[in-house]
A protein has these predicted regions:
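A cross-family signal for N-terminal binding/gating loops and helix N-caps
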Residues: 1-109, 113-115, 248, 264-268, ...
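Basic, nucleic-acid-binding surfaces and adjacent catalytic neighborhoods in DNA/RNA-processing proteins
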Residues: 22-41, 54, 147-274
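Phosphate/anion-contacting hairpin/loop surfaces
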Residues: 66, 70-171, 176-183, 191
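Generic detection of long, well-ordered alpha-helical segments
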Residues: 1-4, 88, 138, 142, ...
Length: 274
């Protein structure tokens, strides 16, 4: 599943390529995505200009000139492709095609169809069921040790799973919390209320640093992820623990272990992380 760095990379590509463009027509496949397409989807897009791109957690927000927003979530295997000169060629698993007046096109492709697209008015954003319960962005200044201490007070859940809860902080996916916990020398099994203030401070710094480095490298590509131009990310070559079960720890040479937590794989060094 694309995590925050991957979605941010896509948003930056959209910003470079579609701002100011006019939508002239759209096409939808006959197969629904995770949810049915909203009513009058195609008509709501027609003749609209793209004025802004933003991101909230793992959601892509394409703002139009009538104060409506095209909201996209990539799900597990979704990707957006941009074509400078589109030749009407559809490929397997294309589900949304948005054509612009200069003959360029934005195409949503999704093998497993776990992603979705919706259209909402900007006034509905705060109450939208997908967006309303989202907490702080991890790269924001407000995501600090004082905030996190309050959120974790009395919580006995393990620190790894709780840091992936959107009601604590958004967008810190499985890859990046594994890497951040390793750098912070915190075991993913440790109860959240047992993590000391100085450890939380280190964890926050590492989350911010890891996410920023991943963004700078275009995200991580494990299977399907690619950016708007079809290029893969490169941060996977910097993984210290994620996906490295039974390989030597880069710091102490102890074998990296993998356990299952809440249905997800956790990778850690039992010697370095306590």
């Amino acid at each position: 599943m694309p995590e925050l760095p991957e979605v941010e990379t896509v948003c930056r590509g959209l910003q470079e390529n579609i701002i100011g463009k006019k939508i002239v027509k759209s096409w939808l496949s006959e197969k629904n995505l995770r949810f049915p397409y909203p009513e009058n989807f195609i008509n709501k897009l027609k003749n609209r200009y793209i004025v802004q791109i933003s991101r909230r957690a793992r959601y892509i927000l394409i703002h139009m000139d009538n104060q409506e927003i095209l909201l996209i979530h990539l799900g597990m295997t979704g990707k957006l492709n941009f074509y400078q000169n589109y030749d009407n060629h559809k490929i397997k698993h294309d589900h949304i095609i948005i054509r612009f007046s200069d003959n360029s096109a934005l195409i949503y492709n999704d093998v497993r169809r776990f992603g979705f697209a919706d259209i909402l008015h900007i006034s509905e954003q705060a109450d939208n069921k997908m967006l309303k319960d989202l907490e702080l962005e991890p790269l924001s200044e407000d995501f600090n040790v004082q905030y996190l201490q309050k959120k974790l007070a009395g919580k006995k859940m393990n620190i790894k799973n709780i840091m992936m809860d959107n009601k604590i902080v958004v967008g810190v996916g499985n890859i990046y919390i594994n890497e951040s916990l390793f750098l912070s020398r915190i075991s993913p099994k440790k109860s959240a209320n047992e993590v000391k203030k100085e450890e939380l401070d280190m964890l926050i710094k590492n989350i911010k640093n890891i996410l920023q480095k991943a963004i700078n490298k275009g995200g991580s590509t494990l299977r399907d992820y690619q950016n708007l131009d079809g290029d893969v990310g490169n941060f996977q070559f910097d993984f210290r623990v994620y996906g490295r079960e039974d390989k030597n720890c880069v710091d102490c040479k102890t074998k990296i272990q993998r356990i299952r937590q809440n249905g997800r794989s956790s990778f850690f060094c039992p010697s370095c992380q306590r």
